[in-house]
Amino acid sequence: MKENELKNEKSVDVLSVKQLESQKTVLPQDLFRSSFTWFCYEIYKSLVFRIWMLLWLPLSVWWKLSNNWIYPLMVSLLVLFWGPVFVLVIFRLSRKRSLSKQLTQFCKEITKNTPSSDPHDWEVVAANLNSYFYENKAWNTKYFFFSAMSCQEAFRTTLLEPFSLKKDEAAKVKSFKDSVPYIEEALEVYFTEVEKQWKLFNSEKSWSPVGLEDAKLPKEAYRFKLTWVLKRIFNRRCLPLFLFYLHNVFISRNDGTIARPLFLVVLFFIMTRDFRNMRMIVLSVKMEHKMQFLSTIINEQESGANGWDEIAKKMNRYLFEKKVWKNEEFFFDGIDCEWFFSHFFYRVLSAKKSMRALSLNVELWPYIKEAQLSCSEESLA
């Protein structure tokens, strides 16, 4: 027991030291009013934006020298409307290219600072890389990464997921060349920190539900699941879509009578799909929420449908107490909870292909397998 307490104290000390270090760092999110103003500043400082602005000089000369105003007008309109599109595309490609050339340094910073899945651990990494990119002329400003979360997301999309999906060493060398050993070392450090976080999180039982005996699932409060779904998807964000639909029905006379109800059906299915995806996006804001979900599945004593009902109750209470969800109705019942795990966790793991706007959860693969194994054992028991 004393050894475990000492290990936990050491891990807590490490976390506190990392938080103190992150407090000293200054990132663009601390300097700019918002991410939009930061993005505008980055665009303004980019070479492609300056080239676009310089294009107006020969165009203005052409306007003065030309006798026919039609051709200068057409070219000016093209530059005016399509210019910003090309600026944005080339700007994003240049960011991607600059980052791909600095993968080795990216990995060295990860190995040095040992960040975990907590976004705060990435603040030092983001600040150091911002300075390195600017000093070594890899980027023309000191603000490549806006925040620690953007740095962590870049690590996930540039290194973690692409490298983990490579099947053999030859494919890794072909894609990442000389950076392979540095990437392997960085991923090993990252996975070690995530494992520490999981063990600490799973052993301390940092959260336990209180008064769960009185908790009820939404299936007990609503007569039909459709009622629960409609309540979730019919909110203020849907108001513009409904106004558009009412405009088509009552004002426009060009639409056929069949198209109107068909539009409503399609709209309903789109909103239902977005609601399902939104739940996973909300859960993915913090890794600890996903870890809590997997830990709850693994540690559940009940089996079968009753077990999933208990998991749904615990997660509904947890997400409400952590202010992730506005009420205790995240999961409708155990069946909905089981579908959520199978669809957003195990299916992604089996296919090893990310869904739109959702990550692969590479660092959670061992725990997803463990959760699936515990579910299989419970079903056989």
From Swiss-Prot:
Is Zinc set as a keyword in this record?
A: no
Question: What membrane topology is given?
Answer: Multi-pass membrane protein
Q: Which residues lie on this side of the membrane: Cytoplasmic?
A: 1-42, 91-381
InterPro entries named in the record: DUP/COS (IPR001142)
Q: Which UniProt keywords apply?
A: Membrane, Transmembrane, Transmembrane helix
Which protein family is it in?
A: Belongs to the DUP/COS family.
User: What domain of life?
Assistant: Eukaryota
Q: Which GO terms describe its biological process?
A: protein transport to vacuole involved in ubiquitin-dependent protein catabolic process via the multivesicular body sorting pathway
Alphabetical GO CC annotations of the entry are: endosome; fungal-type vacuole; membrane
- Where is this protein localized, as stated in its record? Membrane
Q: Where are the transmembrane segments?
A: 43-63, 70-90
Q: Could you tell me which residue ranges are on the Extracellular side of the membrane?
A: 64-69
What span is annotated as the signal peptide, if there is one?
none
Q: What is this protein called?
A: Protein COS6
Primary location: membrane
